[in-house]
Design a protein with these regions (language model features):
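Conserved catalytic core of sirtuin-type NAD+-dependent deacylases
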Residues: 1-248, 272-276
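Short, basic, low-complexity termini and linkers enriched in Ser/Thr/Gly/Pro
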Residues: 240, 245-269
Length: 276
């Protein structure tokens, strides 16, 4: 971790705060990352599972993979990094969480102002009638699942070679161009177009802070880069108090609330993460 940090001072002065997250933020909840040791792409080929061509070739195989990931993620809980980001949303006058994660854990932690650039594992999308619906069935009773209209359903996620949801990408780009602080947590910063957002923010004058286990292509460009586990580093960086045993106290009262805030309360102490 960098010896000193100006993040708290910058946040105190900031009007618009953006956070970009990747798989590393959920790693300590027990959700596997994609790249690096233990990453999904070490075990599976993205071309076989995460492209539209792979799905058309073998929807059953792709759905079996997604079903097994949904089963694992269904047992996972947000960790201290998710909770810290949820508290940050309550503190910032204007805030946007831009996540590449499809696991839904940020929402579970209490974030409301968020865009999911790569979709969500708990939604399905009918290839025939185009309807997008929530689907929480774990495990799936039929693989591949079908829509009421008889059409083939696919996970409502973004695969390689596919366009990101245009409204989500536009909102993320607009916020990156105009924010005062841009925090980047647990992403390898290699998958485009998400990987360009911190650079856009930096060029437009934002204070850019990265938290990651290891250096990334962003490290040399960021104002601060902190290396270690997000669930340990992020609450400390944000000044969230901890008790005598070192457990962070995730209470809204630990932050000054914007006066007009009417959002739901942030959930309390994190639950135990599941085993991967
Ligand atoms: C911790 C930690 C702890 C671990 N604490 N840290 C320009 C140049 C080159 C290529 C392209 C380009 N533009 C587009 C492309 C192609 C491609 C791309 O970027 N490829 C690169 C890999 C080279 N991009 C696309 O295809 C995108 N589409 C697109 O651009 O379309 C254009 C278009 C326009 C109009 C019409 C048609 C097309 C789509 C990208 C979709 C990505 N999809 C996936 C799968 C989602 C569904 C699913 O989950 O199954 O999204 S791939 C995967 O990577 C997933 C992630 O969201 C994404 C990013 O990964 P992330 O989150 O960064 O995870 P990791 O594993 O890479 O990194 C984890 C990090 O955490 C590491 O750094 C660890 O060190 C760290 N860490 N534990 C802190 N405890």
């Amino acid at each position: 971790m960098a010896a000193t940090s100006q993040l708290q001072e910058r946040l105190a002065e900031a009007r618009r705060v953006a956070v970009l997250t990747g798989a590393g933020v959920s790693a300590e909840s027990g959700v596997p990352t994609f790249r690096g040791a233990g990453g999904l792409w070490r075990k599976y080929r993205a071309e076989d599972l995460a492209t539209p061509e792979a799905f058309h070739r073998n929807p059953k195989l792709v759905w079996e993979w997604y079903d097994s990931r949904r089963q694992l993620i269904a047992r996972c809980q947000p960790n201290a990094a998710h909770r810290a980001i949820a508290l940050l949303e309550h503190r910032a006058p204007e805030f946007l969480l831009i996540t590449q994660n499809v696991d839904g854990l940020h929402r579970l932690a209490g974030n409301v102002r968020l865009v999911e650039l790569h979709g969500n594992l708990w939604r399905v999308h009918c290839l025939d009638d185009g309807q997008v619906t929530e689907n929480l069935e774990v495990p799936l009773q039929a693989i591949p699942p079908r829509c009421g209209c008889g059409g083939l359903l696919r996970p409502d996620v973004v695969w390689f070679g596919e366009a990101l949801p245009p409204e989500a990408l536009q909102a993320a780009s607009d916020f990156a161009e105009s924010c005062d602080v841009f925090l980047v947590v647990g992403t390898s910063v290699v998958v485009q177009p998400a990987a360009s957002l911190p650079t856009i923010a930096r060029r437009r004058g934002a204070y850019v802070v990265e938290v990651n286990l290891e250096p990334t292509p962003l490290t040399s460009l960021a104002h601060e880069s902190h290396h270690g586990k997000a669930a340990e580093i992020l609450p400390r960086l944000l000044g969230i108090p901890s008790d005598a045993s070192g457990n962070f106290e995730f209470r809204i009262s630990n932050f000054e609330m914007p006066s007009s805030d009417s959002r739901p309360p942030t959930p309390g102490t994190p639950e135990k993460p599941c085993s991967p």
